[in-house]
Amino acid sequence: MKEKYILSIDEGTTSTRAIIFDHNGNEIVSAQKEITQYFPEPGWVEHDANEIWMAVQTTIANAFIQSGIWPGQIAAIGITNQRETAVVWDKDTGKPIYHAIVWQSRQTTDLAEKLKKDGYSNLIREKTGLIVDPYFSATKIRWILDHVPGAQEKAEQGKLLFGTIDSWLVWKLTDGQKHVTDYTNASRTMLFNIHTLKWDKEILNLLNIPEKMLPEVRSNSEVYGTTASYMFFGGEVSIAGMAGDQQAALFGQLALKPGMVKNTYGTGAFIVMNTGDKPTTSNNNLLTTIGYGINGKITYALEGSIFVAGSAIQWLRDSMKLIKNAPDSEKAAYESTSENEVYVVPAFTGLGAPYWDAEARGAIFGVTRGTTDKDMIKATLQSLAYQTRDVVDTMQKDSGIDIPALRVDGGASNNNYLMQFQADILGKKIERTKVLETTSMGAAFLAGLAVGYWKNIDELKHVFTIGQAFEPKMGDLERKKLYDGWQRAIKATRVFAHGE
């Protein structure tokens, strides 16, 4: 009998990947395709949902071809995805009626501000765990219904469907047979009540979004359906695990005990803390969200979302032309001779947690005649670590838990300079996993558990391993001095955006 594997579809903000894992958690093959970014107006970010679907098909086919594995050897498919990004499509034709509005996009700022001014912030916070912000799906759906002629009427007639990217992909993979999402993705829409685990009728009425547009909400580990018979060279494969990218990473890191924290350095950086079976309300602008729901039990989490992380390194490469590829940033940072007096605040699309300032824009401080390109690169890398500390400090305040270590993953966690500086500025141990793609691994774990590929979570503990740890080396006085400088830079950035 041929060996069985798990296929993870990892649909991210800048690219789509298909990764095949074996029973020991080894990555057998990874196929990747970049996604076109559309910027119709300043601050707007959109994707073509059809292009995303084509990229998923291409990467899956390439993974099979490169590995020699055939669909009959796939025990299950797990899906993980960029969250909040909103797709609205025609139920009959299966065609999107507008581009997918991406989580980073600020085109619905006016709608979010109106909700705040009308006094709905507390209601929405209490029900969804989220703050009112253009980041989440709700205002994106409202924007599409407002700006596409006839869309509201069609939605009310049940002719339009909404989904986050997971929902869109399951719809396409099952040839329109299943319109479902999972607890984690639903909890990021600003429409889902995280206490009742249902779409919230009061918020839907407030935004005039018909509930019939919305997908059925399911757990993170169960069989949702099978792929259509004409796909994957004729093999029908169970789709059995789904989670938004950051919750998938939390599960992939096996951060399954209250107080465990992970940071994924992707396009943005996302720090998530397991808070157990009761939601923890933040007094400092962190998000209360669903970590995962399996076997009839919900685990909640606190999250701090940083909008710009890996995309700051892309900015160095693509816009500033200071590096040719991302790994060059590590070498440049080590070669910089500056005393860390330069600060880059990469608020290209506003500031995320704990500030939630949609109007802030990027700024650079402390530049002298002697500042070099390497100093700028180093300061940009350091900005990821400073922003992470902003969130970790806030999590400790909200939870009352002293976080002993931070588990890290994602592309930028491969940068040794950044990881050491992260340990130094936090004064905490950094644990980098052996498999950096824990987002895909988490989706694989969820799918594998659903079909018995792995018997239970104890079996997963033998699969997961820490690759390298970074201990803090910086003294307390130096740490305080550098972080004080960062806080001044943040304050000045916000003053510039808003005036005194």
From Swiss-Prot:
Keywords (A to Z) from UniProt: ATP-binding, Glycerol metabolism, Kinase, Nucleotide-binding, Transferase
Amino acids binding sn-glycerol 3-phosphate: 13, 83-84, 135, 245
Protein name in UniProt: Glycerol kinase
Subunit organization: Homotetramer and homodimer (in equilibrium).
Reported function: Key enzyme in the regulation of glycerol uptake and metabolism. Catalyzes the phosphorylation of glycerol to yield sn-glycerol 3-phosphate.
Residue positions binding ADP: 13, 17, 267, 310, 411, 415
Organism: Lactobacillus acidophilus (strain ATCC 700396 / NCK56 / N2 / NCFM)
GO terms for cellular component: cytosol
Origin: domain of life: Bacteria
Reactions accelerated catalytically: glycerol + ATP = sn-glycerol 3-phosphate + ADP + H(+)
Pfam families named in the record: FGGY_C, FGGY_N
Pathway the protein acts in: Polyol metabolism; glycerol degradation via glycerol kinase pathway; sn-glycerol 3-phosphate from glycerol: step 1/1
